[in-house]
A protein has these predicted regions:
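S-adenosyl-L-methionine
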Residues: 2-78, 86-93, 114-142
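Conserved beta-strand/loop positions that form the S-adenosyl-L-methionine
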Residues: 80, 103
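Conserved glycine-rich SAM-binding loop
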Residues: 83
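Conserved SAM/SAH-binding beta-strand->alpha-helix loop
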Residues: 106
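A short glycine-rich, Lys/Arg-flanked "PGG" loop and its adjoining helix->strand segment in the class I
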Residues: 167-181
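Conserved beta-strand signature within the Rossmann-like core of class I S-adenosyl-L-methionine
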Residues: 181-189
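Class I S-adenosyl-L-methionine
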Residues: 198-242
């Protein structure tokens, strides 16, 4: 673990306070959105959340173990920002031997993902809504991950927001360190300039090698991707290996 004492972890995002009690202003890779569920989402939540969703407060408990939430050993795949689970459900069903940790902060998205994963008959996904970078750094052991999936992360296209992008040198190093030898980081984006930055950042990371690749045929075309294609955006797939 990053912290040498597993009983004590850094405060999670939204919990870091100054001495006067004010919340620390943080640079996050996502925006906060509403958490209210509609009737269909609530039904999925009620059906699956108790078994498949890791409560936020659970990660603060001494001795927290990801493996215990899966109830078995298996190759660990981390899905960062899976949205409503269109890709997560299909890929999880195709990888029944893998333990898939789906990191998504938007609660309605988690609820829709639960419905899709359940409909796909996949029982190997556990959802966590704690900040993905904090989770990777503090809950995921180095050299323990077989794959990381980062499909269509927010491009934060305004220059002043580029600091909020997920793929930065600091984040790339931390994620690369979580990959086992031979582990893979798969990415996709419909924003050409972000794809170029991804290549620049990941090519410069000495733990990784790879680049732009043909579209991964196992990755389903999601509603989000179809919208990008309808706007004539170029979809770029990347693969880097440790």
């Amino acid at each position: 673990m990053t912290d040498p004492n597993p009983q004590i972890r850094p405060a999670r995002p939204h919990q870091k306070l100054l001495d006067d009690g004010r919340t620390v202003r943080e640079v996050l890779t996502y925006t906060r959105r509403g958490s209210r569920l509609d009737a269909k989402q609530q039904k999925a939540w009620d059906a699956y959340a108790a078994e498949w969703v890791i409560p936020d407060e659970a990660v603060d408990e001494p001795g927290f173990s990801l493996e215990s939430w899966f109830g078995r050993k298996g190759p660990l795949i981390v899905d960062i920002g899976g949205g409503v689970g269109e890709a997560t459900a299909v890929l999880a069903a195709n990888r029944p031997e893998a333990n898939i940790l789906a990191l998504e902060v938007w609660r309605p998205g988690v609820a829709e993902s639960l419905a899709r994963v359940g409909a796909a008959g996949a029982t190997n996904v556990r959802f966590c809504s704690v900040d993905a970078l904090w989770t990777l750094e503090n809950l995921v052991e180095p050299v323990s991950v077989s794959e990381v999936w980062t499909f269509f992360p927010d491009p934060w296209h305004k220059t002043r927001h580029h600091k909020r992008r997920l793929v930065t040198p600091t984040n790339a190093r931390m994620i690369a360190e979580r990959l086992a030898p031979g582990g893979i980081w798969r990415l996709a984006t419909d924003w050409v300039e972000y794809a170029e930055q991804m290549v620049e950042v990941l090519d410069a990371e000495p733990l990784l090698s790879g680049g732009v690749v043909e579209r991964w045929d196992e990755r389903p075309v999601t509603k989000f991707e179809r919208k990008g294609l309808a706007k004539d955006r170029v979809i770029t797939d990347l693969l880097y290996r440790r």
